């Protein structure tokens, strides 16, 4: 979906952006909520690059807008505020990528998953009387793909440990975080 000739704008909805590696494995990059500029994540791709970007709709509905890359570039060059926005977008995405890399390398598998769960709070968290419900179904495969964990079985084992410690509970296939303070140090 991420062609070189078009810019993809997510107007509304939630998508998962992933990279399909040469060997067919999927590496999850981010969840994105609209409005968002999805194509800027793959702006540096060339035709000879050995991986592709996949954009998968995660919400019940999502709407997109396609704009010619050439037209977008021309408008950005002419509009200083838009240029500043695009530059800030790149900086924020770079900071998020560096943060995620830090979480994965400094915390090990468990810590990477703890940080990921904590970060889901700001994206999809809804407080209730028991804790914070991650109001989206996130599979063990998705968590593995975001955290650099090789199998969903490893994710299952780590989540089981969190359930036994009363940090999380699964409610209608969604994660209910009972103790966000337990996860927070891994996300700082």
What is each of the regions a protein language model found here?
Residues 17-24:
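Cytochrome P450 core scaffold surrounding the K-helix E-X-X-R motif
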Residues 123-188:
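Phosphate-/nucleic-acid-contacting segments
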Residues 14, 36, 61-63, 142, ...:
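Structural motif
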Residues 81-147:
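Polybasic "coupling" helices that flank or enter modular domains
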Residues 1-12:
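Regulatory nucleotide-sensing modules
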Residues 1-2, 21, 32-36:
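Conserved short histidine dyad/triad with adjacent acidic residue
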Residues 28-91, 95:
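Cyclic-nucleotide recognition modules
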């Amino acid at each position: 979906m991420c062609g070189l000739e078009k810019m993809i704008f997510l107007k509304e909805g939630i998508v998962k952006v992933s990279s399909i590696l040469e060997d067919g494995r999927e590496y999850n990059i981010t969840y994105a909520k609209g409005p968002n500029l999805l194509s800027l994540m793959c702006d540096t791709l060339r035709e000879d690059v050995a991986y592709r970007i996949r954009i998968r709709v995660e919400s019940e509905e999502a709407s997109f807008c396609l704009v010619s890359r050439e037209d977008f570039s021309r408008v950005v060059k002419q509009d200083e505020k838009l240029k500043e926005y695009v530059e800030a977008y790149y900086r924020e995405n770079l900071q998020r990528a560096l943060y995620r890399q830090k979480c994965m390398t400094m915390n090990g598998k468990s810590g990477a998953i703890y940080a990921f769960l904590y970060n889901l709070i700001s994206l999809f968290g809804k407080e209730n009387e028991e804790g914070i419900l991650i109001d989206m179904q996130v599979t063990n495969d998705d968590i593995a793909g975001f955290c650099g964990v090789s199998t969903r079985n490893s994710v299952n084992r780590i989540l089981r440990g969190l359930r036994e410690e009363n940090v999380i509970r699964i409610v209608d296939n969604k994660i209910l975080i009972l103790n966000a303070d337990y996860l927070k140090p891994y996300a700082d």
